[in-house]
Amino acid sequence: MVTDQGDRASEADGGPVRHIPVMLAEVLAALEPAPGKVILDGTFGAGGYTSAILDAGADVIALDRDPTAIAAGQPMVAAAGGRLRLIHSRFSELADHVPEGGLDGIVFDIGVSSMQIDEAERGFSFQKKGPLDMRMSAAGVSAADVVNRAKVSDLIRIFGFLGEEKQAGRIARAIEKRRAEAPFETTRNLANLIETVTPRKAKDKIHPATRVFQALRIFVNDELGELANALFAAERVLKPGGRLVVVTFHSLEDRIVKTFFQDRSGKAGGSRHLPLVTARDATFTPVGKPMVAASEDEASRNPRARSAKLRAGVRTPAASPGNDLSIFNLPELASLARLGG
């Protein structure tokens, strides 16, 4: 769970980070775990939320696409005495593991975990020499595949949209020139090039490579698409009165969650660019404020919490209107399948 741009620097720069569940008190207050309830933790990670939910008396189904997290969580499974199922799966596929309308609550903690950042061989950090990988699972296209094979125009879009990198064009063209001489293989290869092309200024709070590495990670793991589809899946498997709680650390992720809850509130009214939306019954009603940020005290103790935002909703009995990814206005980027070669 990396933090937002300047606030992300400590994790994105690769410094050791002890896993502390972000906004744990707020998550539990919104989720309301209790004996007899079944809660799904869609992003198990180091198990911080799962542990607290179990302590509250609820049973837990936990998912993670990272096999390393699944292996590390086995002692917790053993200690839970049958109250915890830990499944190797993307959270967008959660409906494959639970019956429709069968859950009392779902929590998502979006982003990369501190465990992944700390392992140089995973290739998430540019301050640790490792393979240019960034995959949350062992399968699929790596960051090296993207950097070495994508068209310059595609790299510009990836860096510009997913990383909000203002120097996307300059960096992409430098990558094209460098890879013609030798392919990028390590995190240092790429980080050093970016730092040469866009040197760090004294006023800069983050390393010049932060946004590009962020963009590559989001792209390689299709994090925005995964989140959007996970929200739709959550809507199908929550029972009436069930609660969906989502913690995000980046404006792109938060925008998707905000859009989803607005669309499902039955109050979405279109915009100057889109026609008015036909009114329909709400499938979610808000829990408390539309958005809750981490407290100043928590942010001072845990830098990862500085950009955290929590949004939550309660499932109504209304039928799901179905999956329509167009509501999120996601960009058209290069195909991961094509880059796999």
UniProtKB/Swiss-Prot annotation:
Segments for region (Disordered): 292-318
Positions with a binding annotation for S-adenosyl-L-methionine: G47, G48, Y49, D64, F91, D109, Q116
Record InterPro entries: RsmH (IPR002903), SAM-dep_MeTrfase_MraW_recog (IPR023397), SAM-dependent_MTases_sf (IPR029063)
EC number: 2.1.1.199
Recorded superkingdom: Bacteria
Keywords recorded for this protein, A-Z: Cytoplasm, Methyltransferase, rRNA processing, S-adenosyl-L-methionine, Transferase
Catalysis performed (reactions): cytidine(1402) in 16S rRNA + S-adenosyl-L-methionine = N(4)-methylcytidine(1402) in 16S rRNA + S-adenosyl-L-homocysteine + H(+)
Entry's localization field: Cytoplasm
Cellular compartments per GO CC: cytoplasm
Methyltransferase is among the record's keywords: yes
Pfam families from the UniProt entry: Methyltransf_5 (PF01795)
Any GO MF annotation of the entry: rRNA (cytosine-N4-)-methyltransferase activity
CDD domains (alphabetical): AdoMet_MTases (cd02440)
BP GO annotations: rRNA base methylation
Function in brief: Specifically methylates the N4 position of cytidine in position 1402 (C1402) of 16S rRNA.
Stated family: Belongs to the methyltransferase superfamily. RsmH family.
Protein name as catalogued: Ribosomal RNA small subunit methyltransferase H
